[in-house]
From Swiss-Prot:
One of its GO terms (cellular component) is plasma membrane. The gene is OR3A4P. Gene3D superfamilies: Rhodopsin 7-helix transmembrane proteins (1.20.1070.10). This is Putative olfactory receptor 3A4. InterPro entries: GPCR_Rhodpsn, GPCR_Rhodpsn_7TM, Olfact_rcpt. It is found in: Cell membrane.
């Protein structure tokens, strides 16, 4: 245990992450597996972004939000996996206290953005299918940017609040965390200070960023399902369902793992179940998301060929913002991105 002295108390200056396993024979195998998972996630996500930028059929609000959703997926896996890989090939599994706080902040920042963007995408599907006549005015370019900006502000506020609330806690006993990355509520179990306020803040965050978005997503898709079932055309029903099925799959994986993780606040100690759920939440889910959305893109025939349609007036440059990060396409301004191109008159 690495301790520093402050007066008569021993203060923890580092934590020790036990990681996935302490079995030396398994570590090289796990290193290769998670390295491949990391490369697959980065490659798949960049492919999705490239397709959205270059294919005019994808210049609709739904894929604008998908492009923004891809960024926190890359961020989440980049916050956790590289450090885990280094632990597989190093005997030093310690992490400085401040580095632990930084990891926790960025993870909650990116995971929070995921929560809000998934909710926005459900609302977008509701407008596109249930309010199609007014969709273009209700989901204008300005509104798209405002929604993404709000998701950044809310997720940043929550991440900063949780991190600032954790920083004054005293850790004067064991410093071993039975996990492979720093996240709540594991540090609570090691604190020799009261964590009552921290528990309340985490509960409020879970309600605001977990329960409320999940309720909104459920209500949105209840209306969508009712509207789709009223469509007489089999092709129309298939197209509507295809634009929603991939998103519902991602929502199920994301919230399924998140609910399990943050309902274990009362557990006495971390278990291997927490590590398994952590792997699903931080590695498997971001890796599957590009594969799921690629399947959806293929289903709607958006990736099979480059659009050859002409005569569409150019809109604003392709811009995507997430948590104050923006990228601008090094291409000519795409047709119709400001609202909807003729190929996406109903956001589909």
């Amino acid at each position: 245990m690495d301790l520093g002295n402050s007066g008569n108390d021993s203060v923890v200056t580092k934590f020790v992450l036990l990681g996935l396993t302490e079995t030396a024979a398994l570590q090289p195998i796990l290193f290769v597996i998670f390295l491949l998972a990391y490369v697959t996630t980065i490659g798949g996500t960049l492919s999705i972004l490239a397709a959205i930028l270059m294919e005019t059929k994808l210049h609709s609000p739904m894929y604008f939000f998908l492009g923004n959703l891809s960024l926190p997926d890359v961020g989440c896996v980049s916050v956790t996996v590289p450090a885990m890989l280094s632990h597989f090939i190093s005997n030093d599994r310690s992490i400085p206290y401040k580095a632990c706080l930084s990891e926790l902040f960025f993870f909650h920042l990116l995971a929070g953005a995921d929560c809000f963007l998934l909710t926005i995408m459900a609302y977008d599907r509701y407008l596109a299918i249930c309010q199609s006549l007014t969709y273009s005015s209700r989901m204008s370019w300005g509104i798209q940017q405002a929604l993404v900006g709000m998701s950044c502000v809310f997720s940043f506020t929550n991440a900063l609040t949780q991190t600032v609330a954790l920083s004054p806690l005293n850790f004067c006993g064991p410093n071993v965390i039975n996990h492979f990355y720093c996240d709540l509520p594991q540090p609570f179990q090691l604190s020799c200070s009261s964590v009552h306020l921290n528990g309340q803040l985490l509960f409020v965050a879970a309600a605001f960023m977990g329960v409320a978005p999940l309720v909104l997503i459920t209500v949105s898709y209840a209306h969508v399902a009712a509207a789709v079932l009223r469509i007489r055309s089999a092709e129309g029903r298939k197209k509507a369902f295809s634009t929603c099925s991939s998103h519902l799959t991602v929502v199920g994986i994301f919230y399924g793992t998140g609910v399990f993780s943050y309902t274990r606040l009362g557990s006495v100690e971390s278990s291997d179940k927490d590590k398994g759920i952590g792997i699903l939440n931080t590695v498997i889910s971001p890796m599957l998301n590009p594969l799921i959305y690629w399947t959806s893109l293929l289903d709607v025939g958006c990736i099979s060929h480059c659009s050859s349609d002409a005569g569409v007036s150019p809109g604003p440059p392709v811009q995507s913002s997430l948590c104050c990060l923006q990228f601008t396409a090094l291409l000519s301004p795409p047709p119709g991105w400001g609202g909807l191109s003729p190929l996406n008159s109903h956001g589909l």
